[in-house]
Amino acid sequence: MSRYTGPSWKRSRRLGISLSGTGKELARRSYIPGQHGPNHRGRLSEYGMQLQEKQKLRWMFGLNERQFRTLFARAGKIREGQHGTNFMILLERRLDNVVYRLGLATTREQARQLVNHGHITVDGKRVDIPSYEVKVGQTISLKEKSKNLQQVKDALEAVASRPSFVSFDEDKMEGQLVRFPERDEMEPEIDEALVVEYYNKLL
């Protein structure tokens, strides 16, 4: 399945959350496209709620359905912890997401572009695979010439805070995943139990 390439604001308004994390998509209108006001949203069925939550999480991290389902299945094979929480942790460990969490990009989409274009290194070696799974203690940085990118400078200036499961050295412009995140440190807008229920009916 191909990745959606349409306007992200339409998806954000449809789901009622900011998928980019910036909040700009909902600044003017928080109701879905096609509605003429905020009070015309229909009530979803149980399946509709599960599907919507799955789409919300998938679009938030920018994965296509095949990638998303594969990662979900992997999470189910982890013996310790809950399936949904383990799935969220695997999503957080993606290289593009860690780049975003470190503040080197303002959105996950921008972080994915940095990785795709070869600007990111892991332990000193260039990695251009957004789905690369970051291990605790690995050092994430920019290629030396990439440290002067204006979009990176702008992103770093915009950082208000970083989650405690990552560390960042401002002088070296490099950071690490210091531990796996706890559930309350990950996306609060997501009810991953609904995602688990959705796939349990299919798989």
From Swiss-Prot:
It comes from the Bacteria. The keyword Ribosomal protein applies. Residues 93-153 form the S4 RNA-binding domain. Keywords: Ribonucleoprotein, Ribosomal protein, RNA-binding, rRNA-binding. InterPro entries: Ribosomal_uS4, Ribosomal_uS4_bac-type, Ribosomal_uS4_CS, Ribosomal_uS4_N, S4_RNA-bd, S4_RNA-bd_sf. Disulfide bonds: none annotated. CDD domains: S4 (cd00165). GO terms for biological process: ribosomal small subunit biogenesis; translation. GO terms for molecular function: rRNA binding; structural constituent of ribosome. The keyword Ribosomal protein applies. Part of the 30S ribosomal subunit. Contacts protein S5. The interaction surface between S4 and S5 is involved in control of translational fidelity. Belongs to the universal ribosomal protein uS4 family. This is Small ribosomal subunit protein uS4. It comes from Lactobacillus delbrueckii subsp. bulgaricus (strain ATCC 11842 / DSM 20081 / BCRC 10696 / JCM 1002 / NBRC 13953 / NCIMB 11778 / NCTC 12712 / WDCM 00102 / Lb 14).
